């Protein structure tokens, strides 16, 4: 295995351990990026920050199919803060996205990958 394959395998292992700890109500990773780097757009036009949260930020049909007023609105900003400070869910996509944008997890993944190759 090459370095990239090893690092990706380590990332998957770290991701699984984070999810397992979150499932046990042990907040391991705060700072979720749901609603900041990702969003959900339903077939009805509802814009949501996350698939798990029962929160609708607005409907794209009400803004002439323009996302910006919803994305930059007060409700979206409020939920971003709430998610970043209090969310530690088990939704793999959000865990993975958050890992990619937090140096702590990038360094941990790289360190474990390099250690595996030694």
Task: Please place each PLM-identified region on the residue numbering.
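Iron-sulfur (Fe-S) cluster-binding modules
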Residues: 108-118
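Accessory C-terminal segments flanking Radical SAM cores
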Residues: 1-108
């Amino acid at each position: 295995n090459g370095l990239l394959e090893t690092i990706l395998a380590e990332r998957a292992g770290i991701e699984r351990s984070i999810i397992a700890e979150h499932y046990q109500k042990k907040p391991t990773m705060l700072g979720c990026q749901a609603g900041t780097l990702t969003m959900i757009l339903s077939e009805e036009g509802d814009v949501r920050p996350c698939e798990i949260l029962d929160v609708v930020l607005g409907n794209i049909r009400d803004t002439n199919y323009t996302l910006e007023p919803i994305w930059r609105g007060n409700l979206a900003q409020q939920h971003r803060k709430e998610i970043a400070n209090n969310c530690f869910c088990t939704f793999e996509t959000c865990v993975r996205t958050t890992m990619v944008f937090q140096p702590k997890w990038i360094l941990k993944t790289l360190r474990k990958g390099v250690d595996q190759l030694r």
